[in-house]
Regions:
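Single conserved hydrophobic/aromatic residue that forms the stacking wall/gate
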Residues: 1-7
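Glycine/Thr-rich phosphate-binding loops that ligate phosphate moieties of nucleotide
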Residues: 4, 12-13, 22, 35, ...
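Short loop-beta-helix segment that forms the pyridoxal 5′-phosphate
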Residues: 16-18, 22, 80-81, 101-112
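Accessory "access/gating" subregions that flank catalytic or transport cores
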Residues: 74-77, 81-90, 107-110, 122
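Conserved phosphate-binding catalytic cores of ATP/NTP-utilizing and phosphoryl-transfer enzymes
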Residues: 94-103, 113-130
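Short beta-strand scaffold segments in enzyme catalytic cores
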Residues: 118-122, 139-143, 223
C-alpha cells in the first residue's frame, strides 16, 4: 500500500491510469497460472491484509486521503483475486508458460514468498525459537512465535506469513555490508590498499585479518550501526552512525572491527527487545554473502550475542526454500509431502506437518557452527551495557543527530 501511495504522490497521472497495482511476484503468478492470484504473504506484510478480515476498513485509508478510501478494490484488484500462501497450490502452468520454461503443463505453482523469508525452510526453520539472520548489504532478522505480541519497531508482524500455525515476525538493520563498504571506499588509506595487494588479498580480507589480531575492547572504540538509520526497534531513518573513542593513534583495522561489533551489538539489542515479550530466540541460523566470506564477523556475532551461530553454506537459500514450499503443496501420491487430498480445505496443522517433512528432507545440511568464546563474551557483555546507553541516549533522549541533518544553508 505504501508504494501505491508513493506513486500517487509523485506521479498522479500514472496512478490514475493504472488499472491496478501488483507485486512483481504476483504478476509472475498471474503469468504462470493465468489466474488472478495474490501472495498472501506479501499482502500480510506489505498491504495490511488479514485472512479473515481482508484489508482494513475504508475509513483508515480515507483518513490518509479521501480518494484512497476504496484503494483495495480500485487499485489492488482485491475483489476478484485469490490469496494463496507459499505452501498452497495456486494452480498449474499455462500451456504457454510450460512451453517457454520447458516444463510439464501439470507443474504446480504455489503462492509467492518474500525473498529473505523464503529461506526459512531451506535452513530447517519450521518452528518457533529459531531465527533466520540474513546478512548482506543490510540485515534481515526473521523469527516465529506461537502467539501474537505487539512488539514496537519491527518491520512486520503477521499471522501465518511464513509458516502455518505460527506468527511471523521480521526485524532488521538498515546497514551492514553497506556500512563496511562505505568505510573501505571513503576512509581506508592507500597504504592499507597497497599492503593488501602485496599480500594478494582483497581489502575486506586483509582488514579482517588485521582486526582479528585485536581483542574485544582493545581498540577503545564503540560504534552505533546507524549509517542508514535504525530499522529496528527504533524505526527511525533520521538517526545516523557514530564512533566513540577515536584518537590520533586509532588505526583503520580498529575502526573496521568497531563497525563489525556495532552490527553485532545491534542484533543483540533486537534480540533483547524481542525476548522481553516472552518470545525465545534459541537457535540462530545465518545465510547471505557476508556469512560465508567473513568468519571473523560471524565469530563476533557469537561472542557478542552469547548464542551459537549456525552459518549455512547455501548460496541460493530462497530458491531452495521455494522448492520446499512447493514440495509441501504437492500431494504425496505425486511425489510431494502434502496430504493425499490435492484439492479442498486442509487444517493448518496438516500444512505445517507437510512443510516440516519437506524441510527435514530437503534442507541445507552444509553448515559451520560458531560457538561463543566465554572470555570474549564477558568483555562484550560489559561493552554491550555501554552500547545500550549510547543507543538509548542518541536514539530516544538527545536528538542531536536529527538536528545536524536538518541544518541547511
Amino acid at each position: 500500500v505504501g508504494s501505491e501511495m508513493c506513486i500517487r504522490d509523485r506521479d498522479r497521472k500514472v496512478y490514475d491510469g493504472a488499472a491496478y497495482f501488483l507485486e512483481a511476484a504476483d504478476w509472475l503468478l498471474c503469468k504462470l497460472t493465468g489466474k488472478q492470484i495474490r501472495s498472501a504473504s506479501f499482502a500480510l506484510c506489505k498491504g495490511l491484509w488479514r485472512e479473515k478480515q481482508g484489508y482494513p476498513e475504508a475509513g483508515l485509508f480515507a483518513e490518509i486521503a479521501p480518494e484512497l478510501e476504496n484503494i483495495p478494490e480500485q487499485k489492488l484488484g482485491a475483489k476478484n483475486a485469490l490469496y494463496i500462501y507459499p505452501w498452497e497450490k495456486a494452480g498449474t502452468l499455462t500451456e504457454e508458460a510450460a512451453e517457454e520454461l520447458k516444463l510439464c503443463a501439470d507443474t504446480i505453482v504455489t503462492g509467492a514468498q518474500m525473498d529473505a523469508h523464503a529461506g526459512l525452510p531451506a535452513l530447517g526453520i519450521t518452528d518457533a525459537g529459531k531465527v533466520l539472520l540474513v546478512v548482506g548489504t543490510s540485515t534481515g532478522i526473521i523469527f516465529q512465535g506461537k502467539s501474537r505480541k505487539e512488539i514496537q519497531g519491527l518491520c512486520s508482524i503477521a499471522d501465518y506469513c511464513d509458516l502455518p500455525e505460527l506468527i511471523g515476525y521480521a526485524a532488521g538493520q538498515a546497514s551492514t555490508g553497506d556500512c563496511l563498504e562505505w568505510f573501505i571506499k571513503n576512509s581506508v588509506p592507500g597504504y592499507c590498499q597497497e599492503q593488501a595487494r602485496e599480500a594478494g588479498k582483497d581489502i575486506f580480507s586483509w582488514l579482517s585479518e588485521q582486526a582479528e589480531k585485536l581483542k574485544p575492547g582493545q581498540n577503545g572504540l564503540l560504534a552505533l550501526d546507524w549509517w542508514n538509520g535504525n530499522r529496528s526497534c527504533l524505526a527511525d531513518q533520521e538517526l545516523s552512525g557514530l564512533i566513540l573513542g577515536l584518537g590520533l593513534e586509532t588505526r583503520p583495522e580498529e575502526i573496521y572491527r568497531a563497525l563489525l561489533e556495532a552490527c553485532a551489538f545491534g542484533v543483540k539489542r533486537i534480540f533483547k527487545e524481542v525476548e522481553q515479550y516472552g518470545i525465545p530466540l534459541k537457535e540462530i541460523h545465518a545465510c547471505g554473502g557476508i556469512t560465508q566470506k567473513n568468519p571473523l564477523f560471524m565469530q563476533i556475532y557469537a561472542d557478542v550475542t552469547g548464542k551459537k551461530i549456525i552459518v549455512h553454506r547455501c548460496e541460493q537459500a530462497p530458491a531452495l526454500g521455494m522448492a520446499i514450499y512447493a514440495a509441501a503443496a504437492l500431494p504425496s501420491v505425486k511425489g510431494g509431502y502434502g496430504s493425499g487430498a490435492e484439492e479442498g480445505p486442509q487444517t493448518e496443522a496438516v500444512r505445517h506437518a507437510a512443510l516440516s517433512a519437506a524441510s527435514a528432507n530437503m534442507q541445507s545440511r552444509d553448515f559451520e557452527v560458531y560457538t561463543p568464546q566465554e572470555e570474549y563474551h564477558r568483555v562484550y557483555e560489559s561493552m554491550g551495557e555501554e552500547f545500550d546507553r549510547l543507543y538509548d541516549y542518541f536514539g530516544m533522549e538527545n536528538h542531536v543527530m536529527k538536528k545536524l541533518k536538518q541544518r541547511q544553508w
